[in-house]
C-alpha cells in the first residue's frame, strides 16, 4: 500500500496531535470553499412547486425533475419489512431528527416514486463543508434523488452532527462515523425494507474525504454491496483497519471523479481535490480493490462536476459487473496529474 508523504495527506485521527495541525491548515481553506459554494448558489431562487429543476448542471442534459424538499413536508411513514407503517405508499421525509449517544443531527429521506414490490437500494449522500446542499435540496439533491429513483433506490441525505464552526464530516471522523452508522442501522435499515447489497455512499468534497478516510478505511463492513462515488476529493488514509472480504474487494465499485482544474490554485476553491483524488484512488487500488476507477475531467473545477451523471453510471456499473463504463473510465486525452498520488491533503 502507498502511504502519501505530502503535507496533510494522512487522515486526522481523534486523539491525535495531528488534528490540531490539520484543523489549522485546512479549516480555513475548506471554509472558504463552503462560503464560495453558498455565494455561488445563493442567488438561485428556489423553484416553485409547479416548476421543474433542470439536471443539466449536474451532467444530465435532458433530465428535469420536480424540486424536492422546498416545503419541508414529512411523509406518512417509512416502509417496514412486511408492510407499511401508516399509509399506502411513502413520500419524502425531511429534517428528521436522530440522536445517538448524546449526539443529535437530522436527515432527509427521498422516497417518492419507489416501487416497494421490487428490491430497493439506498444511496447515502454526504454533503461538502458548510452543508449548503442539505439546507437547499431543491437543486442538486433533487437530481441525485431522481437518479437514485431511476435505480429504485431511496436517497438519504444526512447533515453532519458537527456544530463547531463550519459543519464538516472530516474534522471528527470517529465521532461523526459513529453517529452516521447508528443512523443507518437504527433508522434507515431498521425502518425501510432495503436490499443491503445495493448500498451506495456518495460524497462531495469534505463528504468524499469522510468516505475515503473513515468509512472505507475503517468501516468497510458497512458496505455489503454497491460501492462508493467520491466527487471532488477522497484522499488517501494513513492507515486502514478494515478487513474487506474477497467478495467486497472484487465486487464493490469505488470511483473517484475530479476536475483537472480542481488543484487548489483557484482562490475560491483552495482545497487541492485533484491531488486528494489521485492519492485516494492509488491507495485503494494498491490495497487490492479490483473495481476502482478515477476520471480526471478537462476544463472542470470544484463546482462543475457532473455528479448526477456519474452516480447514474456507477450504479449502472454495480448492476452490470461485466460491463465497463465509459463514463467512469479516464478520458483518452487525460492522464493522472504528475506526482499527485503523493501530494494529496486532508
Model-found features: residue ranges?
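Catalytic active-site module of serine/aspartate enzymes centered on a nucleophile-bearing elbow/loop
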Residues: 309-340, 344-345
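Primarily recognizes the serine-hydrolase "nucleophile elbow" in alpha/beta-hydrolase
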Residues: 191, 197-249
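Short substrate-entry loop that stabilizes the transition state in hydrolases
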Residues: 114-167
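N-terminal Sec-pathway targeting helices
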Residues: 12-28
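The feature captures the conserved acid-bearing segment of alpha/beta-hydrolase catalytic domains
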Residues: 226-315
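A domain-start/cap signature at the N-terminus of enzymes
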Residues: 2, 21-24, 31, 35-121, ...
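Terminal targeting segments of Actinobacterial cell-envelope proteins
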Residues: 1-17
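Alpha/beta-hydrolase active-site loop
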Residues: 169-193
Amino acid at each position: 500500500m502507498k502511504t502519501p508523504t505530502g503535507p496533510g495527506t494522512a487522515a486526522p485521527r481523534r486523539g491525535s496531535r495531528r488534528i490540531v495541525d490539520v484543523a489549522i491548515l485546512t479549516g480555513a481553506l475548506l471554509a472558504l470553499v463552503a462560503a464560495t459554494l453558498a455565494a455561488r448558489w445563493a442567488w438561485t431562487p428556489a423553484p416553485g412547486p409547479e416548476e421543474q429543476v433542470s439536471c443539466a448542471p449536474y451532467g444530465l442534459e435532458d433530465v428535469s425533475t420536480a424540486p424536492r424538499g422546498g416545503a419541508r413536508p414529512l411523509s406518512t411513514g417509512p416502509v417496514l419489512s412486511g408492510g407499511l407503517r401508516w399509509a399506502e405508499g411513502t413520500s419524502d421525509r425531511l429534517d428528521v431528527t436522530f440522536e445517538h449517544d448524546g449526539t443529535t443531527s437530522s436527515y432527509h429521506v427521498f422516497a417518492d416514486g419507489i416501487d416497494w414490490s421490487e428490491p430497493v437500494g439506498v444511496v447515502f449522500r454526504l454533503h461538502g463543508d458548510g452543508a449548503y446542499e442539505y439546507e437547499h435540496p431543491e437543486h442538486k439533491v433533487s437530481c441525485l434523488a431522481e437518479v437514485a429513483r431511476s435505480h429504485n433506490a431511496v436517497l438519504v441525505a444526512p447533515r453532519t452532527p458537527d456544530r463547531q464552526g463550519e459543519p464538516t464530516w472530516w474534522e471528527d471522523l470517529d465521532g461523526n462515523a459513529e453517529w452516521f452508522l447508528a443512523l443507518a442501522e437504527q433508522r434507515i435499515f431498521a425502518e425501510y425494507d432495503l436490499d443491503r447489497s445495493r448500498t451506495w455512499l456518495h460524497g462531495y468534497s469534505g463528504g468524499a474525504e469522510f468516505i475515503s478516510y473513515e468509512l472505507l478505511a475503517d468501516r468497510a463492513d458497512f458496505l455489503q454491496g454497491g460501492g462508493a462515488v467520491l466527487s471532488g476529493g477522497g484522499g488517501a488514509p494513513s492507515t486502514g483497519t478494515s478487513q474487506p472480504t474477497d467478495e467486497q474487494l472484487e465486487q464493490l465499485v469505488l470511483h473517484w471523479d475530479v476536475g483537472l482544474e480542481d488543484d487548489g490554485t483557484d482562490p475560491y476553491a483552495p482545497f487541492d481535490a485533484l491531488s486528494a483524488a489521485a492519492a485516494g484512488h492509488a491507495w485503494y487500488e494498491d490495497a487490492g480493490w479490483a473495481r476502482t476507477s478515477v476520471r480526471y475531467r478537462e476544463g472542470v473545477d470544484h463546482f462543475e462536476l457532473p455528479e448526477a451523471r456519474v452516480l447514474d453510471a456507477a450504479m449502472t456499473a454495480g448492476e452490470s459487473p461485466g460491463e465497463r463504463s465509459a463514463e467512469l473510465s479516464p478520458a483518452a486525452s487525460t492522464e493522472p496529474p504528475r506526482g499527485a498520488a503523493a501530494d494529496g491533503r486532508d
